[in-house]
Structures are given as structure tokens and as C-alpha cells.
Amino acid sequence: MKMGMAKHSPRNKEYLCLTICGYRKEGMSEEAYRNHMVNVSAPMTKDLMVKYGIRRWTQIHNQNATRALMAELFDPQMCRLADFDCFSQVVFDNIEDYKRMKQDPWYKKHLMHDHEMFADTKRSMMTIGWIKEFVVDGKAV
């Protein structure tokens, strides 16, 4: 099997997940950042993702109010707080699907420029890996 291809069978379904650990643009408030991502970028992006076979796309907004909740979860092993403003996760079968989406003329014209409106693209980071589920809808799998 080629690297970047998901492994499929009825009992073993694995997808790739691109995780973008994002920082907001300098000087932008948390609320303005979240608003732009949810109400401007997402509506422009989601149909294009569907067109290219993206299975799932989520945003996790890591604002001061939710970061404060971490004090209730820290323990001696887990005590370092990630300072990213958002985690955006894109799930797909094949890395080629995502690459084709990024080559779409509409993506190049509208979305590449949009990232500069809200994101600190110099500090934000990415990683990719296989998803392996152990609990789904409250049930062990």
C-alpha cells in the first residue's frame, strides 16, 4: 500500500487526519478570530472540501475561558498547556484528495488570501497522522 493511502476493510477503517495548530493574527481578538473562522472561512471552505472527498473537518477553539478549565485536569504527568488559538482537523482517505483541493483555482483565489486575514501563518504548525478510534458514541470499539 502506498504511503498516504487509507487502509480500508469493513473491520479496519483508517483515515488520515491533518491537524493544523493555529495562532491568530497579531492584534486580533479571540472572538474576532473565532468569528472569522466560523462565519467567514468555514462557509467558503466546506463545500470545496466535500467536492474533493474530505470526510470530516472540525475546528477546536482554544480560548481563554476554555484554557482556564485545564486547571481542573492538570496532574503531575500532564501539566503543560498548549498555547495555540485553534486546532483545525481535516480527515480524508487519501492525501491526494487534499492536494487536489489546494490546486483548485477557487481555493487559490479565495482561500489562500483568506488565511492571511485571521491566521499567523508564520507561527502556526501542522502535522498528519492516522486516526485509530477506541470509543465511538460512548461505546468501546
UniProtKB/Swiss-Prot annotation:
E.C. number: 4.1.1.-
**GO MF annotations for this entry?**
lyase activity; oxidoreductase activity
**Keyword Cell cycle among UniProt keywords:** no
Which reactions are catalysed by this chain?
atrochrysone carboxylate + H(+) = atrochrysone + CO2
Q: What UniProt keywords apply to this chain's record, in alphabetical order?
A: Lyase
Question: Which residues belong to any copy of the EthD domain?
Answer: 26-121
Alphabetized SUPFAM superfamilies for the sequence = Dimeric alpha+beta barrel
Q: What class of enzyme is it?
A: lyase
Known Pfam families for this protein?
Answer: EthD
Induction notes from the record:
Expression correlates with the formation of the sclerotia and thus the pigment production and is directly regulated by the cluster-specific activator CPUR_05433.
Against InterPro entries, the record matches this protein to: Dimeric_a/b-barrel (IPR011008), EthD_dom (IPR009799)
Function text: Decarboxylase; part of the ergochrome gene cluster responsible for the typical purple-black color of the ergot sclerotia. The ergochrome gene cluster produces several ergot pigments including the yellow ergochrome secalonic acid and its derivatives, as well as the red anthraquinones endocrocin and clavorubin. The pathway begins with the synthesis of atrochrysone thioester by the polyketide synthase (PKS) CPUR_05437. The atrochrysone carboxyl ACP thioesterase CPUR_05436 then breaks the thioester bond and releases the atrochrysone carboxylic acid from CPUR_05437.
The UniProt entry's sequence similarity note says: Belongs to the tpcK family.
Would you tell me the protein name for this molecule?
Decarboxylase CPUR_05434
What species was this sequence derived from? Claviceps purpurea (strain 20.1) (Ergot fungus)
What broad taxonomic lineage does this protein's source fall under? Eukaryota, Fungi, Dikarya, Ascomycota, Pezizomycotina
